[in-house]
């Protein structure tokens, strides 16, 4: 178990799969992650099913190719009581699975009581962008008590949304978004 005791700046993602509990203790991590060819660009590249991140704020900028988010590139665990104000960008024509909290959250994972006010964007123009305010892709995941007030910027005409861009089998409950532009998509 880890507890953050001060605000910090991070320039590289935690690359190993995170299996413990990380309590941000109300502090903010400012990210400066700029790797246009990078996958799983976020504070935590991957959160395992046993992993939990809570009470954390994210600021700064994150740029990557696939699985790009504020807290997690890929989440299989639990993210609770977190916020993102960072600009999250999927670079290149292949920039996809981009979300404010997680690029992808899947297979029984949870995102609870979180919000995004950062701009979420992708340079991809084709199908499969999966761009969302909370999670880019959320198959078989649970997203509850969350909101998005961040702008969603994409060249794509499908697979983007205020909460989740894609998500076969996703459960979204008690979530809302503040309208910015013409959001559509899964939720």
Labelled PLM ranges:
Residues 1-187:
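Predominantly extracellular beta-rich ligand-binding scaffolds that present long acidic/polar faces
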């Amino acid at each position: 178990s880890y507890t953050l005791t001060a605000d910090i700046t991070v320039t590289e993602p935690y690359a190993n799969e995170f299996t413990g509990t990380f309590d941000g203790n109300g502090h903010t991590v400012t990210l400066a992650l700029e790797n246009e060819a990078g996958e799983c660009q976020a504070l935590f590249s991957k959160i395992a099913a046993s992993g939990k991140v809570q009470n954390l704020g994210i600021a700064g900028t994150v740029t990557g190719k696939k699985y790009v988010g504020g807290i997690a590139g890929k989440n299989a665990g639990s993210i609770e009581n977190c916020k993102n104000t960072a600009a999250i960008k999927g670079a290149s024509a292949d920039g996809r699975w981009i979300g404010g909290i997680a690029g992808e959250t899947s297979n029984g994972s949870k995102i609870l009581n979180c919000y995004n006010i950062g701009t979420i964007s992708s340079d991809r123009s084709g199908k499969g962008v999966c761009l969302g305010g909370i999670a880019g892709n959320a198959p078989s995941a649970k997203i509850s008590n969350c909101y998005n007030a961040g702008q969603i910027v994409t060249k794509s005409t499908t697979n983007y949304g205020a909460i989740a861009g894609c998500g076969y089998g996703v459960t979204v409950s008690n979530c809302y978004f503040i309208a910015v532009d013409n959001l559509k998509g899964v939720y």
